[in-house]
Amino acid sequence: MENDYLEPIPDDCIICLNISKTYNRRDPDDIRLDLYDCVRKYWVMDINRAKTANRVLAVADGVIIAEYEPESWGHIEHKGRRRCYFEGKEIVPSAYIGKRVTYRGQNPVKYINM
């Protein structure tokens, strides 16, 4: 039986971002209207650490639904707080889509190979 859990490629430095709340909710007051905007904006993280990632994986309900190659990182104000965001391109096809990711605790950001 094939393992359906994420097994990272050794050279990939990965950030997994749990977007279950924003992606599934589709709050009409939220400006994130598509998958890319759900995953790229408003993260609390160390931007210097984030800049070392060569892959960003969007995770909803424990399953990877998209993979991106970040091209740049920056800060943005959101609801009065400074948050990180990235600009990048989607990777299609992806070896990671459909794989499961487990999170411990409540942090929606998970670093792998970093």
Residue ranges and their predicted role:
Residues 1-53, 60-62, 93-95, 100-114:
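Compositionally biased, charged N-terminal/linker segments
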Residues 17, 68, 87-91:
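Short beta-strand element of the conserved SAM-dependent methyltransferase core
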Residues 51-55, 84-86:
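Acidic, aromatic-enriched beta-alpha/helix-loop junctions
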Residues 57-59, 80:
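Positively charged, phosphate-engaging catalytic surfaces used for nucleic-acid and nucleotide handling
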Residues 65-75:
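Short beta-strand-centered aromatic/proline hotspots
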Residues 69, 79-80, 97-100:
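Short conserved micro-motifs at the rims of enzyme active sites and ligand-binding pockets
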Residues 75-90:
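Short, solvent-exposed secondary-structure boundary/capping segments
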